[in-house]
Every structure is written in structure tokens, then in C-alpha cells.
Swiss-Prot record:
Homodimer. It comes from the Bacteria. The keyword Transport applies. Plays a role in the regulation of phosphate uptake. It holds the Pfam family PhoU. This is Phosphate-specific transport system accessory protein PhoU homolog. One of its GO terms (molecular function) is protein homodimerization activity. It comes from Pseudomonas aeruginosa (strain ATCC 15692 / DSM 22644 / CIP 104116 / JCM 14847 / LMG 12228 / 1C / PRS 101 / PAO1). One of its GO terms (biological process) is cell chemotaxis. The gene is phoU.
Length: 242
């Protein structure tokens, strides 16, 4: 089992510093992505095209952070040939940055929908769903990053479990909005923008779950992807304290 103290156990202080640096860079990228998601949701709800444009402009910075962290991981793998928990840390970081970058992409899509809705003027049906699901996925991203920062497999498990709730509520919202469009065809264009924004939010939840699963792999040493929530819970609880 890995914890924060594990990062300081190497004879080489330089290796300790390299591991802590790349982990810190991941969390810094995560903080920026988390802000991007929050701002995208607020831009959509508040019809703030200026804030939406800021979200889209951050995308290049996030992409550059992904490339930089990838390079750090490659250098550590080549120079240090890490094993055991160190190797799991590098693998988890290198995969998590992919999900963070994709969360940023989805936030940018939400911002684009916000700009389009601002241009159309009239507020469409669906903002209640955006506010609700947006709040849920914001919490998932925040807690997935907190779990990574604290090496907390239990918190990571709760993020993965919560993804089912988001998926269920997304499907419910989708049915309601499709019904609304059938009743008022004049609203189709506007409501479609809301539907696509909700789809991006649902995908953000999926990527937050991916990061949570990587935290469990990092801390417990077990790959829990594709095994279902019941077995995932068993793996986390059975390996607790090892």
C-alpha cells in the first residue's frame, strides 16, 4: 500500500524530488481543470459569454501541461527504472493527465454551447438540469483530485460509485428535454445546445471516475477498471490496511 510517506523513502533525494515534482504538477493541472469545469458551468447558467471565452482560452495551457507531465514521466522511467509503488505512481500520473486533458476538452465544449446560447438570446429549458448535474460532476472532479493528493482509496471508491448517479440523472434529463422539444419544436435549436452541454458534463463524470480508479490502483495495487462496483468495493475493503 502506498501513502504520502512512500515518496520520501528513497536513498536518492533527487529521485524523491522528481516524484514529488511530477505529482505536484499533476495536481496543479488538476486544479486548473477543476476551475475550467466550474467556470464552464457558471458561464452556461449565467449566460456569461466572456467567462465562457476564458474557459476556451485556457485549453492550450492545459494541453501544454499534459505534454510537460508526459515528458517528466518518460524521463523518470528512462533514468530511474522505477518498480512497485513508484512505477504505479508514474503509470497513474501518465494516465490521469489524459483524463484531465479530456475533462478540459469537455469543459471547453460546454463553454462553446454557452456562447452559442448567448448569441441566440432567449433562455431555453434545461438550466435546472445543467445546474444540478454540473454541481455533481464538479464534486466528482474535486474529490477524485483530493483522493489522488491524499492517496485515499476510500474517497476514490465513493467517486466511482457516484458516477452511476450522474449517469442515471443524465438519462432522466435527456428524456425530459427530448419530450420538451417534441412539444415545442421552436425550442429545438436551443435545447439541443443544452443536451450537448449535459452530454459533456456526463463525460466529465466518466473521466473523474477513471482518475478515481487509477487512485485505487495506485494505493491498493489492484487494477479495478472494468470489474464493476461490487468487486471494486471488495478490492478496496479487502486490501485496507495492507
Amino acid at each position: 500500500m502506498i501513502n504520502k510517506d512512500s515518496l520520501t523513502h528513497h536513498i536518492s533525494q533527487q529521485f524523491n524530488a522528481e516524484l514529488e515534482d511530477v505529482r505536484s504538477h499533476l495536481l496543479a493541472m488538476g486544479g486548473l481543470v477543476e476551475k475550467q469545469v466550474n467556470d464552464a458551468v457558471n458561464a452556461l447558467i449565467d449566460a456569461d459569454s466572456g467567462l465562457a471565452q476564458q474557459v476556451r482560452e485556457i485549453d492550450d495551457q492545459i494541453n501544454q501541461m499534459e505534454r510537460n507531465i508526459d515528458e517528466e514521466c518518460v524521463r523518470i522511467l528512462a533514468r530511474r527504472q522505477p518498480a512497485a509503488s513508484d512505477l504505479r505512481l508514474i503509470i497513474s500520473i501518465s494516465k490521469s493527465v489524459i483524463d484531465l486533458e479530456r475533462i478540459g476538452d469537455e469543459a471547453s465544449k460546454v463553454a462553446r454551447r454557452a456562447i452559442q446560447l448567448c448569441e441566440e438570446g432567449e433562455s431555453p429549458r434545461g438550466y435546472v438540469e445543467v445546474r444540478h448535474i454540473g454541481s455533481q460532476v464538479q464534486k466528482m472532479v474535486q474529490e477524485a483530485l483530493d483522493a489522488f493528493a491524499r492517496f485515499d482509496a476510500d474517497l476514490a471508491l465513493s467517486v466511482a460509485q457516484y458516477d452511476k448517479t450522474v449517469d442515471r440523472e443524465y438519462k432522466t434529463a435527456l428524456r425530459e428535454l427530448v419530450t420538451y422539444m417534441m412539444e415545442d419544436p421552436r425550442a429545438i435549436s436551443r435545447v439541443l445546445n443544452i443536451i450537448w452541454a449535459l452530454r459533456s458534463l456526463e463525460r466529465i463524470g466518466d473521466h473523474a471516475r477513471n482518475i478515481a480508479e487509477l487512485v485505487i490502483y495506485l494505493v491498493r495495487g489492484t487494477d479495478v477498471r472494468h470489474i464493476g462496483l461490487t468487486r471494486m468495493k471488495e478490492e478496496v475493503e479487502n486490501n485496507r490496511g495492507e
